[in-house]
From Swiss-Prot:
Residues 261-440 form the PCI domain. It comes from Dictyostelium discoideum. Belongs to the eIF-3 subunit E family. Keywords: Cytoplasm, Initiation factor, Protein biosynthesis. PROSITE patterns: PCI (PS50250). Component of the eukaryotic translation initiation factor 3 (eIF-3) complex, which is involved in protein synthesis of a specialized repertoire of mRNAs and, together with other initiation factors, stimulates binding of mRNA and methionyl-tRNAi to the 40S ribosome. The eIF-3 complex specifically targets and initiates translation of a subset of mRNAs involved in cell proliferation. Residues 121-143, 482-525 have a biased composition (Low complexity). GO terms for biological process: formation of cytoplasmic translation initiation complex; translational initiation. The gene is eif3E. Residues 102-120 have a biased composition (Basic and acidic residues). Coiled coil: none annotated. One of its GO terms (molecular function) is translation initiation factor activity. This is Eukaryotic translation initiation factor 3 subunit E.
Length: 525
């Protein structure tokens, strides 16, 4: 219908992966039955499931002769490849039998242990006057123990010796044919053996194809536990092979297969968020498949209660940013709900979109299992936004907008306040929710900035005081140094004066002696 994404998603899937989506459209009656039957016949004709394709052709009156011929051809090729890969099939079967045998042995050991525990019973009865001990009659139970002959498993080294490039290619083609005819479990087992036998530095394209086959086999076999583990090796292989354009296409294919894995395995939905928010995969979404934003938004909202508030807010901000960037390319009620609530703060439009979201989720193959969870968490998001903006909230208005039963509204509101950790109380007299003073984000920024400013001033004052102290100490030192210099200069001057005085005295004494001598000499006649 208007918001149905089956056509867009099927363009990234092969025929086998399309079948569950077409069956769901048939169950939900979103399209006319004859259109669904024609689409089913066209898809089945692309697979090797010839019997189903023949039935689909007959239901719409098409000629089945081409499918009959195709069936005969596939049977002949299957028998030929089966014979060439017989020793690989024997190895796989022996491994499976060994596992079943080990399981039987464990069950036998558990039963024997239970019988031993039940045999250990010795009840006693006590009377007030006489004490009598009654021993329960012993019953002998005959336990039949079946001797299990251990199964001989073909050694892997022996299997490796028989492998040639031709046989390795036969294993690959046999695995692919098993997948085509719908034997997904056997196909996975043979593909796994192919990967073990194939050298890592050779057959890179076939190894990548085998990894895709293993993932799709687990998905179609509903083996979700192993399918989760299949994604990581594929990511590594995609990152290390191909051109950037090829890697972009491969990542888009992986994203669409991941929808099967993560939405049908609720415990790992957070892993889908981590995958889709990686830069490489977010780029693939924006470039090739913006419709995946629907599933990213649902996964984030559904996982709200499982994440810390700061982590959820960071992820939500990333979602809002990419939804706004791609709004001109892709829109649906889910992305418009995100935009109306977290960007425009238009509660009326958000509520209108939320009503449409419920219909879209119920008709979506991947999202129909999480309708209630999404709607509940979306209401909590609306309530949180109300609380962040308004100081008082009318309860009747809240119940009307969020479609909450008035009788159970008080319980819902109390639980929502507790989970969101808001400071609020219910005013029963006025039928309102009173919010205590909430610090807006800009106020918190101002308060933190003010504290940093005050701290900066304190640091500047401290630095100036330190410098002043250093200057004062430096001034005192300089004064002391000048005083010492003066004293030294005075001492030097004093010593110089004393030296000059001594020299003058000596000269005067010498002059006096000379004069006296000259005067005393007699004059000759």
């Amino acid at each position: 219908m208007e918001y149905d994404l089956t056509k867009q998603i099927c363009s990234f899937l092969d025929a086998h992966m399309m079948l569950p989506l077409i069956n769901y459209l048939k169950d939900t009656q979103q399209y006319q039955e004859n259109e669904i039957n024609k689409a089913m016949a066209d898809i089945l004709s692309q697979t090797g499931c010839c019997d189903y394709a023949i039935n689909a052709y007959e239901s719409i009156g098409r000629d089945t002769a081409p499918l009959q011929a195709k069936k005969q051809e596939l049977v002949g090729e299957l028998n030929k490849l089966k014979e060439q890969c017989s020793f690989v099939t024997q190895y796989i079967e022996s491994k499976k039998q060994q596992k079943e045998q080990q399981k039987e042995l464990k069950e036998q050991q558990k039963e024997q242990q239970k019988e031993k525990d039940t045999d250990k019973t010795t009840p006693t009865t006590t009377d007030e006057t006489t004490t009598t001990t009654t021993t329960a009659p012993t019953t002998t139970t005959t336990t039949t123990t079946t001797t299990i002959t251990p199964i001989t498993v073909i050694p892997f080294s022996q299997l490796l010796e028989k492998i040639t490039p031709e046989i390795l290619d036969s294993i690959y083609r046999f695995s692919k044919l098993l997948f085509e005819i719908g034997q997904y479990g056997s196909a996975r087992e043979h593909l796994e053996i192919f990967l073990q036998l194939s050298p890592t530095h050779q057959n890179k394209d076939k190894r990548l194809s085998a990894l895709w086959g293993i993932l799709e086999s687990d998905i179609l076999s509903l083996n979700w536990g192993q399918a989760v583990g299949d994604i990581s090796p594929l990511q590594d292989q995609i990152d290390s092979n191909g051109t950037p354009v090829e890697q972009l296409g491969q990542r888009a294919w992986l994203i669409h297969r991941a929808l099967f894995v993560y939405f049908y395995n609720p415990e790992s939905r957070s892993s889908l968020v981590d995958l889709l928010l990686e830069d490489k995969y977010l780029n693939a979404i924006q470039t090739t498949c913006p419709h995946i934003l629907r599933y990213l938004a649902v996964a984030i909202i559904v996982n709200k209660k499982k994440q810390q508030s700061n982590v959820f807010q960071r992820i939500l901000n990333a979602l809002v940013r990419v939804v706004e960037q791609e709004a001109y390319v892709y829109r649906d009620p889910i992305t418009q709900f995100i935009s109306s609530l977290f960007v425009k703060f238009n509660f009326e439009d958000a509520q209108a979109q939320l009503i449409l979201c419920e219909k879209v989720l119920k008709n979506d193959f991947f999202l129909n299992t999480c309708v209630d969870e999404f709607m509940e968490n979306a209401r909590v998001c609306v309530f949180e936004t109300y609380c962040n903006i308004l100081e008082s909230i009318d309860i009747d208005m809240l119940c009307k907008n969020l479609r909450i039963d008035p009788e159970s509204s008080e319980k819902w509101i109390v639980e929502a306040i507790r989970n969101t950790r808001f400071s609020a109380k219910i005013d029963s007299a006025n039928n309102q929710i009173k919010m205590f003073t909430q610090h807006n984000s800009y106020r918190q920024v101002m308060d933190k900035t003010k504290a940093l400013f005050n701290r900066g001033i304190e640091m500047v004052v401290g630095i100036n005081e330190s410098r002043s102290q250093q200057n004062r100490k430096g001034g005192d030192n300089r004064k002391n140094q000048r005083g010492q210099n003066r004293n030294q200069q005075n001492q030097q001057n004093q010593q110089s004066n004393e030296s000059n005085e001594t020299t003058t005295t000596t000269t005067t004494a010498a002059a006096a002696t000379t004069t006296t001598t000259t005067t005393a000499t007699p004059t000759s006649a």
